[in-house]
Regions:
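Activation on beta-sandwich/Ig-like modules and their edge loops
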Residues: 1-132, 138-147, 152-158
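Cellulosome-associated attachment modules in secreted, modular CAZymes
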Residues: 150-206
Length: 206
């Protein structure tokens, strides 16, 4: 679970909510039969034999796939019976066997970001997504004016060498998130997908 739009502003929640997942494994994964759920009573069983996500691929699960209604999001699969609270909620992806594949519990801005019209997105797919500190607010505008990167790298400018040394995540801000990503790169070898922004001293070495 890589990005969550729980509270769109350009359209109503009933048509504009979406969830982005990414396949961080090395194998194709068939999502048919998997369950989208929260800790209450909302569940949706994915029913599509062709819904296969390849290694490194992003996929958008959304409440509506009409671009003219949903804020301009290309949705890969439409779910029903599952809604995202604007305050706190859970997004849980469950294997047909009952095993939890992934889960995120966001918390009304206590540790997770929570801004109207902006998705909350994982800083790096290699980070633990159950920790709010590893998420940030989207800064890229899409569709009708909300902010997010549905179906794309959360920081699409990471591969552009723009001289912003130290801006590890390429979001044009210099803050603690850059420090967290740099330390994570050193200790856990999960580095940002960029070519130059992590080069703090401009020596072309990372």
């Amino acid at each position: 679970i890589n990005e969550i739009m729980a509270n769109p502003e350009s359209v109503v929640d009933a048509v504009g909510e979406w969830i982005e997942i990414i396949n961080v494994s090395e194998s194709n994964i068939n999502l048919n039969g998997m369950i989208l759920a929260d800790n209450d009573s909302e569940t949706h069983v994915i029913s599509d034999n062709t819904l296969i996500i390849s290694p490194g691929e992003y996929m958008i699960l959304g409440i509506n796939d009409d671009l003219s209604m949903n804020g301009g999001v290309m949705v890969d699969y439409v779910y029903s019976g599952f809604n995202l609270s604007n305050l706190w909620d859970e997004v849980i992806l469950i294997h047909p066997s009952g095993m939890i594949i992934d889960e995120v519990h966001y918390d009304n801005g206590n540790t997770f970001p929570n801004e109207n019209g902006k998705s909350m997105m994982l800083i790096n797919p290699g980070l633990e997504n159950y920790l709010g500190e590893n998420w940030t607010t989207a800064v890229t505008e899409y569709g009708l004016g909300d902010f997010g990167t549905p179906g794309e790298n959360n920081f699409p400018n990471n591969n552009e060498c723009d001289g912003n040394l130290g801006d590890v995540n390429g979001d044009d801000n210099y803050d603690v998130i850059d420090v967290v990503m740099l330390v994570n790169c050193i200790l856990a070898a999960t580095c940002a997908e960029n070519e130059c922004n992590g080069d703090l001293n401009d020596d072309d070495l990372f």
